[in-house]
Amino acid sequence: NEYLKNEHSVTTVIADHWKSLEKIDQSLLHNKKTLCLIHSKEINHPVGSGLNERVLNTLSKTNFIISNSNFTKKLAISLNISPEKIKVINPGVEKYEKPSDENIKISKELFKNSFPKLITVSRFDKRKNHDKVIMTIRNLREIYPNIKYLCIGYGDEENNLKKLVKELKLENIIIFKKNINSNLKSAFLNQSDIFIMPSIIYKKSVEGFGISFMEAAQQGTASIGGID
């Protein structure tokens, strides 16, 4: 507030989260274009709840509300956010990065002669549905004995997923990796047959837009997603 009060050259305010805008005095925004980005999980609070009212009051200060997908826009409208203000701008991805020969070699060594080669790149969250994929692979192993599944990421569910893999005796089929560079990630995507991330709605958490699907497409890899 103090900065906006004293800095008269500011013409536009862009908030990356509704909470970033919540405490700004509306009187300081009257001669400025104000935009706020929204994501599904951040606004998904029951209509009439205290958090929903805070979201609505805060977003009433804006000229434009930037949604990352049509899914998020529909969710926002269902939560009584003004549809007239919402503009959909899909997130972008980094410019295409050709995997290095060295990283392609690393990827081929990991997958060896496996088929099909499955991959997921995401946080290990409940809504990403890794556990269902793992249990499905247990059954697919009977049909595809050389199947391989690479999970790249980290998150709260990591230990639970590794425990599940051990219980199902899939340690030689399912591989976990994290903290890899973007070029190696591109190589793994490039060498995979299918990118799989059948996301679900879990409590307030929803998949508003999956950038990983676009990254897989950049490498010519088909995807399987969820309807939620």
Predicted regions and their residues:
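Carbohydrate-associated surface elements
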Residues: 71, 92
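Short alpha-helical donor nucleotide-sugar binding micro-motif in glycosyltransferases
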Residues: 179-180, 187-192
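Conserved donor-binding/catalytic core segment of Leloir-type glycosyltransferases
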Residues: 66, 110-128, 134-137, 150
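Nucleotide-activated donor-binding/catalytic signature segment of Leloir-type glycosyltransferases, i.e.
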Residues: 152, 159-183
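Acidic donor-binding loop of glycosyltransferase active sites
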Residues: 190-206, 221-222
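Nucleotide-sugar-dependent
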Residues: 200-214, 226-228
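Short His-centered aromatic/hydrophobic patch
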Residues: 15-20
